[in-house]
Amino acid sequence: MSKTFKLHSAFQPSGDQPEAIRRLEEGLEDGLAHQTLLGVTGSGKTFTIANVIADLNRPTMVMAPNKTLAAQLYGEMKQFFPENAVEYFVSYYDYYQPEAYVPSSDTFIEKDASVNEHIEQMRLSATKALLERRDVVVVASVSAIYGLGDPDLYLKMMLHLTQGMLIDQRSILRRLSELQYVRNDQAFARGTFRVRGEVIDIFPAEADDEALRVELFDDEVERLSLFDPLTGQLLRTVPRFTVYPKTHYVTPRERILQAMEAIRAELAMRRQSLLASNKLLEEQRLAQRTQFDLEMMNELGYCSGIENYSRYLSGRGPGEPPPTLFDYLPADGLLVIDESHVTIPQIGGMYRGDRARKETLVEYGFRLPSALDNRPLRFEEFEALAPQTIYVSATPGNYELDKSGGEVIDQVVRPTGLLDPLIEVRPVATQVDDLLSEINLRAAIGERVLVTTLTKRMAEDLTEYLEEHGVRVRYLHSDIDTVERMEIIRDLRLGEFDALVGINLLREGLDMPEVSLVAILDADKEGFLRSERSLIQTIGRAARNLNGKAILYADKITPSMARAIGETERRRERQQAFNLAHGITPQALNKKVTDILQLGDGPVRSRTKGARGQRAAEPHPDYHTLSAKQIEQQIQRLETQMYQHAQNLEFEQAAALRDEIHILREQFKNAS
């Protein structure tokens, strides 16, 4: 029998949580397709959802609008369900440049990507968990609506091994090669296998710290055991084991041969069409590229950019939706969309941008028309595939409200008794000097401040001005990547600086109890950055602090401001009434600052102990005395260290070394 969910928490549901849990569960059991949970900041929305999952015992996908929030949710769910399968499914690209063609300058840009192996392993682990068990929570980003290998083919390709099974060594090795595993008797890494006499060691693609040892005797599987690939220590013997493919995109040989025939037929038709339109260059280009891909598929079973032929490989018809993570989710699965007012529009926008780029590639002979079917889901396809759905947001959008028939499950009362921030409106004329004095007041008592501006220029100028006046301040902008952004937020919580200035980056889901003041400059400039939802979300960043306050700098009260202030006051009054009725004194949150990049308690496992305290590079090393040859050697040495740190998820050290290498390269140019 499949394991059931077991929720671990020191707390019992309280405040609005018990009623919200009851209504959500009732709705799901009554077959409601859409429900909306309006949960304010700090009301324990994740805990409510965790209780619903545990009570109903249904496999669940939680979708977040970005990797940062997905990582935060993954960490929380890991703590709630340490005995169950909590998985993480986001895009595995650290860097991704899709292939594109710019007709105006006749520039073709090749696809270029850097895959994060660790996230790839977590994606494989997520699909494996969905196929094998029911006690699964997959925390995903919008990456879940992009094409993935067909689950039916994926299941067909698996290698099942059982103790006592009759199979010769050659057959096992051939099957492993079909699963795209690579033989490597020297470096034993994820997705490889090695052979020593009658013993085959396999490092499963979805595993992080366990490998399989297959011991054969006279063409029979004598013993199957799991061991630690790092130390070689035997962990336990198992009666059976399933080896999953190295990638989601593996395809049986017969399907590849069928696909090749269909691709040849489409190529012939497309060539005729291009020649009839007198597009000779495009016809030649398409024939050359496609025939090269066909040759690669025939010899190796795959080719670069094989995803462009996914329609044929998955056996789907023209225009049919591609297989995605939703195809792996059981029929009675549950979908939770976090920060739905952001996530839903994102899902709706993915298809069109992808389509526009691919149409250009098809028109100019870089791809066959069938490449258009390698795409994310259209919004209506997503709606058709989505199981019973709970939308979670402090500010639900019109779509969610419409889908749930205008009925909203309120979770406004916080168990901690914390009130929504007090709101003050102050004049714009003195906003900068007034802000400076407010920051100094907060810094003196060890509290933090968030400041949101309307433009990048304003944010830069304000940061510079505050720095000149002795404020420890940082500026958060869109050019900062996910990892660095999480480091900045962690440093703010740790007190490395007192104020953080940003534009549209200080809204949904950021969990910072140390922030006691949110300052919104130019709050009376109507627009999406100063809409009712944006203002409520931004004000909510101070709702986790006992002394939470929001200052809106404005010369007039706009309709959006009036609605945001009214809604915040409504929530504040409801919380005060609850506190009074139950004798609750508001308590400060003491949430420990964890390194969110380690994604909960697993499955990340750092290979180096105590590396955190090491210095990645000298603060200001002097390279001027080195020769060009010595600089070259130093670059190679630092690059090796950088990749090692990145592999161990020690991003601060890797980033410091990257900057060091950049300085050295400049020096190398000058020296040579």
UniProtKB/Swiss-Prot annotation:
Q: Where does ATP bind?
A: 39-46
Signal peptide residues on this chain, from the entry's feature table? none
Motif mapping: Beta-hairpin: 92-115
Domain Helicase ATP-binding, by residue range, is 26-183
Q: Which InterPro entries match?
A: Helicase/UvrB_N, Helicase_ATP-bd, Helicase_C-like, P-loop_NTPase, UVR_dom, UVR_dom_sf, UvrB, UvrB_inter
**Domain UVR as annotated: residue spans:** 632-667
Query: Mind telling me which GO cellular component terms the entry cites?
Result: cytoplasm; excinuclease repair complex
Q: Matching SMART domains, A to Z?
A: DEXDc (SM00487), HELICc (SM00490)
According to its UniProt entry, the protein's GO biological process terms are: nucleotide-excision repair; SOS response
Entry keyword set: ATP-binding, Cytoplasm, DNA damage, DNA excision, DNA repair, Excision nuclease, Helicase, Hydrolase, Nucleotide-binding, SOS response
Where the record annotates domain Helicase C-terminal, the positions are 431-597
Molecular function GO labels: ATP binding; ATP hydrolysis activity; DNA binding; excinuclease ABC activity; helicase activity
Q: Which family does it belong to?
A: Belongs to the UvrB family.
Q: What is known of its domains?
A: The beta-hairpin motif is involved in DNA binding.
NCBIfam families named among the record's database cross-references: PRK05298.1, uvrb
Query: What does this chain do?
Result: The UvrABC repair system catalyzes the recognition and processing of DNA lesions. A damage recognition complex composed of 2 UvrA and 2 UvrB subunits scans DNA for abnormalities. Upon binding of the UvrA(2)B(2) complex to a putative damaged site, the DNA wraps around one UvrB monomer. DNA wrap is dependent on ATP binding by UvrB and probably causes local melting of the DNA helix, facilitating insertion of UvrB beta-hairpin between the DNA strands. Then UvrB probes one DNA strand for the presence of a lesion.
- Specify the protein name: UvrABC system protein B
According to the entry, what is the taxonomic lineage of the organism?
A: Bacteria, Pseudomonadati, Pseudomonadota, Gammaproteobacteria, Enterobacterales
